Amino acid sequence: MRKIIVGSRKSKLALTQTNWFIDQLKALGLPYEFEVKEIVTKGDVILDVTLSKVGGKGLFVKEIEHALLTKEIDMAVHSMKDMPAVLPEGLMIGCTPKRVDPRDAFISKSGASFKELAEGAILGTSSLRRSAQLLAARPDLQVKWIRGNIDTRLRKLKEEDYDAIILATAGLQRMGWDDEVITEHLDETLCVPAVGQGALAIECREDDTDLLQLLAHINDAVTERTVAAERVFLHKLEGGCQVPIAGYATLTENDAIELTALVGSMDGSVLLKETVVGTDPEKVGLEAADRLIKQGAKELILAANKGQQ
């Protein structure tokens, strides 16, 4: 019986996601054993700086990918939104389980909705994507950076001078917080989700055919296609955490991919947005990027990157 070593970050959410995925594999009843190996990433260690200033994509995966390449582990369970657009040679996303709710969750101290928040209220987020879109809708709000896991951020909302914070609905749901704390789910038209938000990425070595066959049982074709379009868009624009960039794709009734893509200025004064429909994930992602580039997306990205230096 083969033992599969599964790499995971040490956070409660990461371990919950990893153990959930292992349970899906165990339920197949095939002759495999599983062991979790906890790995500390750079993003887990640097907590006093905003993600955009630390260096963006790959912060939560590089050490785990090193363990995959050196065969310390056989596969890893990541949040898809943490994944860089390009993976190291020899590694691949071997499985994308069914995506859960991709929306952002708005949590306010007083129970006021986003629209009802008092003028000049303080909004906590560590995401340039969220802050740009929400400032575009409410330029009167003040954005204050907030880092830490879900528990830490909820505690900071309670104890510090934040009036509201934004978290990913998916993480809250996976941790069992959902209805208990969420004031409202922000509609995708108000705040386009991050590329891959709500989805998991199961990363493994390309040459591990045995494991790839096992992972195929859990793969969700709809999630795979839609997330692929989002990631092609992200790659073409070379976007990471340093840039207000968003992309969210769904399947239409006739099986086409509909991708809404967005790039914004840091302060939300400019939001470029396009919706592209097509059947091929790569073509849809590239078309969305090309349309935004024609509108000036590259200049916005350049300005955002300069602003982080």
Curated annotation (Swiss-Prot):
Q: What Pfam families is this protein classified in?
A: Porphobil_deam, Porphobil_deamC
MF terms per GO, please?
Answer: hydroxymethylbilane synthase activity
- S-(dipyrrolylmethanemethyl)cysteine modification sites are 241
* Protein family per UniProt: Belongs to the HMBS family.
Recorded metabolic or biological pathway in which this protein acts: Porphyrin-containing compound metabolism; protoporphyrin-IX biosynthesis; coproporphyrinogen-III from 5-aminolevulinate: step 2/4
Q: Which residues cross the membrane?
A: none
Q: What does this protein do?
A: Tetrapolymerization of the monopyrrole PBG into the hydroxymethylbilane pre-uroporphyrinogen in several discrete steps.
General remark: The porphobilinogen subunits are added to the dipyrromethane group.
Cite the NCBIfam families for this sequence: hemC
**Which cofactors, by name?**
dipyrromethane
Q: GO annotations under biological process?
A: protoporphyrinogen IX biosynthetic process
Supply the alphabetized keyword list.
Answer: Porphyrin biosynthesis, Transferase
Q: Which organism is it from?
A: Bacillus cereus (strain ZK / E33L)
The name of this protein is: Porphobilinogen deaminase
EC top class, as a word: transferase
**Oligomer status and interactors:** Monomer.
